[in-house]
Swiss-Prot record:
Source taxonomy: Eukaryota, Viridiplantae, Streptophyta, Embryophyta, Tracheophyta
Organism (species): Arabidopsis thaliana
GO molecular function (one): transcription cis-regulatory region binding
Cross-referenced InterPro entries: Dof, Znf_Dof
Binding site for Zn(2+): 57, 60, 82, 85
Any one of the GO CC terms: nucleus
GO BP terms in the entry: phloem or xylem histogenesis; regulation of DNA-templated transcription; root development; root radial pattern formation
Name of the molecule in the record: Dof zinc finger protein DOF5.3
Region of interest called Disordered, as start-end residue ranges on this chain: 23-50, 104-127
Entry keyword Plastid: no
Keywords annotated in UniProt: DNA-binding, Metal-binding, Nucleus, Transcription, Transcription regulation, Zinc, Zinc-finger
Record localization: Nucleus
Function: Transcription factor that binds specifically to a 5'-AA[AG]G-3' consensus core sequence. The PEAR proteins (e.g. DOF2.4, DOF5.1, DOF3.2, DOF1.1, DOF5.6 and DOF5.3) activate gene expression that promotes radial growth of protophloem sieve elements.
Domain of life: Eukaryota
Length: 257
């Protein structure tokens, strides 16, 4: 009993001492006591975050800087701006060694000139299985244009029966005679063509007759004048000459194309 009283006195003295110090003691801790026991956020230990590494531009690091293109169209990655090359780039892009939009270009000028040279070079014409060129007519080359109006204008300046009324001059009897024979065939067809062109005084003695057209384009009166003329031209000879003239016109047009 004495021991119990002694213990209460000690405990009472302890409580009085705490009250004197401004502290209260309770058997059940209050929420305020629990909050005081927790450490404050200011006193919590914070771990330092590692600094972000400086990202290097893959375009600047590439050795192929001339044709290197960095694809910066990856929308899933953030876009960065490089101050040295002044371009945006992303991590999800890819490097390419070819220029965008590059490629070989065909030389269109050389192709067109080659095609033009092929068009201007005519093939040798043929008639009745005989091949001849138009280069032997009065010295004209394949690239020169034959002025037929000038040739027919010489009709009123030449004598009838001359072989130079169409600008052929003396080639009909020279080395080009083989070409002319290849075009007209026999000597009879060549004679008929001569009547068609007006040789042999077949009615073209009139200087204004050259403006009337060809013999097969004239009316009946003109045919009568041709028959009356001193040459004695006939209709069958005119038809044969017209056929020969058509063949020669076709050959000349092929040479000029």
């Amino acid at each position: 009993m004495d021991h119990l009283l002694q213990h209460q006195d000690v405990f009472g003295n302890y409580n009085k001492a705490r009250e004197a110090m401004g502290l209260s003691y309770s058997s059940n801790p209050t929420p305020l006591d629990n909050d005081q026991k927790k450490p404050s956020p200011a006193t919590a230990v914070t771990r330092p975050q590692p600094p972000e590494l400086a990202l290097r531009c893959p375009r600047c690091d590439s050795t192929n800087t001339k044709f290197c293109y960095y694809n910066n169209y990856s929308l899933t990655q953030p876009r960065y701006f490089c101050k040295s090359c002044r371009r945006y780039w992303t991590k999800g892009g890819t490097l390419r060694n070819i220029p965008v939009g590059g490629g070989c270009r065909k030389n269109k000028r050389s192709t067109s000139s080659a095609a033009r040279s092929l068009r201007t070079t005519p093939e040798p014409a043929s008639h009745d299985g005989k091949v001849f060129s138009a280069a032997g007519f009065n010295g004209y080359s394949n690239n020169e244009h034959i002025d037929l109006s000038l040739a027919f204008a010489l009709l009123n300046k030449q004598h009838p029966g001359s072989s130079s009324q169409l600008g052929f001059h003396s080639e009909l009897g020279s080395s080009h005679q083989s070409d002319m024979e290849g075009m007209f065939g026999t000597s009879q067809q060549k004679e008929n063509a001569t009547y068609a062109f007006g040789n042999g005084s077949s009615g073209l003695g009139d200087p204004s007759r050259v403006l009337w057209g060809f013999p097969w384009q004239m009316n009946g009166e003109s045919f009568g004048m041709m028959n009356i003329g001193g040459g004695g031209g006939h209709v069958d000879q005119i038809d044969s000459g017209r056929e020969m003239w058509t063949n020669m016109n076709y050959i000349n047009s092929g040479a000029l194309m």
